[in-house]
C-alpha cells in the first residue's frame, strides 16, 4: 500500500469518527454563524445568502461579544498578556536571568505583532464558543517568522494521542492550479494538474489534503525533514494513486486545537455557549415570527365582504371609497375577526429569551473585559461584580492555556530559536525548561479573586495591631508583597529581588549603626566637657570624688 493510499484510509476512518457531530454543527451555524463552515471544498467563494433562518440576531451579537471579549481579555495585542519564568523562583531574582527573559518576551511580542496571529485568534475564539472545537496552524514564514492559518469548522479531522490531547490532523481544502504549481512545483503535481497548467486553466480548483501526525517510524538521530517528530504530507484528493505533493515534518505539532469542554475520551468538544443557547436561539426566532404575525393581523387583518362585489375594485387605502349594494343589513367590508393588539407578553418573553442567550455567552462579563482595555476600567471592578462567572470560566481558561496558548508560545519560541532570533541565555539557564505565566486581563482577574483575601487579612491585622502592636510580628511582608505583585500582574523588573532587598537593609543597618556610634561619641564628648567645667567647691560630688582619691 502506497503512502497516499494509507493516508486516504486514515482519512476515511477520521471522517466516520466525526460524522455524528456534523448535523449539530450545521444547525449551530444556521442560527448563529451561517458562513463559518466549510464541509465541502466546493463552498469556496460561494456568496449565496445563508442566514434565512435568522430573524433575531441576538445569538450572532452575543457570539461576537464573546469572541471580542476573549480577544481583549486573553490575548489583547494592546497589552502584555504573557510572561516567561524559570521553574526555580529564586532564579528569577538573578538580574542576568531577569533581563534575558525580558528581552525574549519583547522579541516574541514583536513576532506576534508582525504575524497574522491577532487576525486569526478571533476566529478561533468564535469557533470554540459556537462549536466547542477550533483549529489553527502555526507555520514558519521567511518574512514574518510565523504565519497562522485558521481552519473553518468542517474542513478538518482530528484525533487524540495517549494523553487525550490532539496530535493528528487531516485538513481538506482547495488550491488553484496556479497555487499548486507555485507551492509544490510542476514536477510534483498530478498529470491532471499538469494538463490544466499546460492548457492555461490556472484558476481551476483542486482538492488537497494536508495530514500531520506522529512520525512513529522516524529514525532517531537523523535530522532530515522526513525524520522529525511529526510527519507532514500534502497530497491531491484525486489524481495519481501513489503520488504525494510533499512529504516532510515538524519538530513540534503545528496545529492548535482547543476545545471548550470535552466529555471523556471524545476528540471534539462536547459543550460550549453556542450549544447551551441553541434551544433559546431557536425559540427566539419563533417568538419573533409570532410577534410579526400578530402585528400583521392587527395592521393588515384578513377581510370579509359581500359576494356581490367579488369582481369589483375595493379600496382599502385611507380615504378610499368602495360602493356596496344596500340590500341586506350586513352589506359591508370588515375584518373576519378582531385581533387584540396586546403584544406586551410576547415582548417580555422575547426579552427574557434574549437574556438567556446573553447569559449563556457570558456577554456581561466579556463586555466588562472590553471596557478594561478601552476605558481603563480597573480589574478589581470585574472581580467584585462578576466573581461567580470568573470562577465558572476557570476550567475553560485552563484548557485554553494548555491546548492553545502554551502550544502557541512553545511553537513560536522554537521557531525563533531555530532562526537564531533569540539572545544567548546566561550559563545558569543552559538546558533549563521555561514556564509561561499569563498576565492578561482575564488571567489577572482569575488570580485576583484571591487578592481580596490578602487585602482582608491585612486589614484585619492592621485593625488588631492598633490594640496589640506585636500582632504585626506575624506578618511576612516580603512574601506578601511578592504574592500580591504576582497576582495582579506586576512586572518583576519593578519589584526588588531578595538579594537587592537584603543589600538595601544591610546598608541601612550599617548607616543606622554608624549614626548611633556618632551619637554616642557626641554624647561622651559633651559629658566630658560638662564634667571639665564643673567647679571644684568643697560640696561638689567631683570634689568629694577627688578627695576620696587622695
Q: At which residue positions do the language-model features occur?
A:
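Charged, amphipathic alpha-helical segments
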Residues: 111-120, 205-216, 464-467
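Extended, helix-rich architectural segments
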Residues: 1-203
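Long, contiguous amphipathic alpha-helices that act as assembly "spine/axial" helices in icosahedral shell
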Residues: 48, 63, 96-140, 270-303, ...
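Structured, contiguous alpha/beta core segments that scaffold functional sites
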Residues: 12-13, 140-318
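Short, hydrophobic/amphipathic alpha-helical patches that form generic packing surfaces
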Residues: 30, 63-75, 276-287, 459-463, ...
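Exposed alpha-helical structural elements
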Residues: 6, 65, 69, 96-99, ...
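C-terminal anchoring/interaction modules
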Residues: 1-30, 37, 300-550
Amino acid at each position: 500500500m502506497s503512502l497516499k493510499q494509507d493516508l486516504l484510509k486514515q482519512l476515511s476512518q477520521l471522517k466516520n469518527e466525526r460524522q455524528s457531530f456534523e448535523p449539530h454543527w450545521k444547525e449551530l451555524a444556521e442560527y448563529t454563524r451561517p458562513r463559518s463552515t466549510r464541509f465541502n471544498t466546493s463552498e469556496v467563494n460561494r456568496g449565496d445568502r445563508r442566514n434565512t433562518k435568522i430573524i433575531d440576531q441576538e445569538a450572532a451579537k452575543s457570539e461576537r461579544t464573546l469572541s471580542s471579549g476573549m480577544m481583549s481579555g486573553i490575548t489583547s495585542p494592546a497589552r502584555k498578556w504573557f510572561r516567561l519564568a524559570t521553574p526555580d523562583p529564586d532564579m528569577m531574582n538573578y538580574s542576568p536571568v531577569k533581563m534575558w527573559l525580558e528581552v525574549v518576551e519583547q522579541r516574541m511580542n514583536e513576532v506576534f505583532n508582525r504575524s497574522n496571529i491577532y487576525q486569526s485568534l478571533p476566529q478561533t475564539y468564535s469557533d470554540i464558543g459556537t462549536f466547542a472545537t477550533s483549529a489553527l496552524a502555526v507555520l514558519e514564514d521567511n518574512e514574518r517568522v510565523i504565519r497562522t492559518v485558521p481552519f473553518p469548522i468542517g474542513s478538518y479531522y482530528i484525533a487524540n494521542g495517549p494523553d487525550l490531547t490532539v496530535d493528528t490532523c487531516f485538513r481538506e481544502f482547495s488550491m488553484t492550479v496556479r497555487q499548486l504549481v507555485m507551492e509544490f512545483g510542476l514536477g510534483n503535481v498530478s498529470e491532471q494538474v499538469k494538463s490544466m497548467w499546460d492548457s492555461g486553466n490556472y484558476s481551476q480548483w483542486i482538492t488537497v489534503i494536508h495530514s500531520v501526525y506522529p512520525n512513529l517510524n522516524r529514525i532517531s538521530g537523523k535530522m532530515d525533514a522526513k525524520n522529525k517528530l511529526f510527519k507532514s504530507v500534502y497530497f491531491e484528493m484525486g489524481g495519481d494513486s501513489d503520488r504525494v505533493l510533499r512529504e516532510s515534518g515538524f519538530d513540534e505539532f503545528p496545529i492548535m486545537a482547543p476545545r471548550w469542554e470535552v466529555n471523556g475520551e471524545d476528540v471534539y468538544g462536547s459543550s460550549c455557549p453556542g450549544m447551551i443557547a441553541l434551544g433559546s436561539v431557536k425559540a427566539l426566532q419563533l417568538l419573533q415570527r409570532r410577534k410579526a404575525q400578530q402585528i400583521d393581523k392587527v395592521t393588515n387583518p384578513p377581510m370579509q365582504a359581500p359576494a356581490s362585489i367579488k369582481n369589483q375594485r375595493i379600496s382599502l387605502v385611507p380615504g378610499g371609497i368602495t360602493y356596496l349594494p344596500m340590500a341586506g343589513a350586513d352589506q359591508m367590508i370588515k375584518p373576519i375577526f378582531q385581533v387584540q393588539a396586546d403584544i406586551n407578553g410576547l415582548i417580555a418573553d422575547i426579552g427574557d429569551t434574549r437574556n438567556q442567550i446573553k447569559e449563556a455567552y457570558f456577554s456581561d462579563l466579556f463586555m466588562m473585559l472590553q471596557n478594561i482595555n478601552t476605558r481603563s476600567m480597573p480589574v478589581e471592578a470585574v472581580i467584585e461584580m462578576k466573581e461567580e462567572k470568573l470562577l465558572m470560566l476557570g476550567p475553560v481558561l485552563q484548557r485554553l492555556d494548555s491546548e492553545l496558548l502554551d502550544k502557541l508560545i512553545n511553537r513560536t519560541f522554537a521557531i525563533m530559536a531555530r532562526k537564531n532570533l533569540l539572545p544567548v541565555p546566561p550559563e545558569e539557564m543552559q538546558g533549563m525548561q521555561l514556564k509561561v505565566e499569563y498576565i492578561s486581563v482575564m488571567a489577572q482577574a482569575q488570580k485576583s479573586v484571591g487578592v481580596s483575601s490578602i487585602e482582608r487579612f491585612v486589614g484585619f491585622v492592621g485593625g488588631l495591631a492598633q490594640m496589640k502592636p506585636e500582632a504585626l510580628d506575624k506578618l511576612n511582608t516580603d512574601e506578601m508583597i511578592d504574592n500580591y505583585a504576582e497576582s495582579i500582574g506586576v512586572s518583576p523588573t519593578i519589584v526588588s529581588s531578595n538579594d537587592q532587598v537584603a543589600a538595601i537593609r544591610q546598608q541601612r543597618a550599617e548607616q543606622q549603626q554608624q549614626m548611633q556610634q556618632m551619637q554616642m561619641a557626641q554624647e561622651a564628648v559633651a559629658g566630658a566637657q560638662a564634667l571639665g567645667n564643673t567647679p571644684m567647691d568643697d560640696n561638689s560630688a567631683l570634689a568629694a570624688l577627688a578627695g576620696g582619691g587622695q
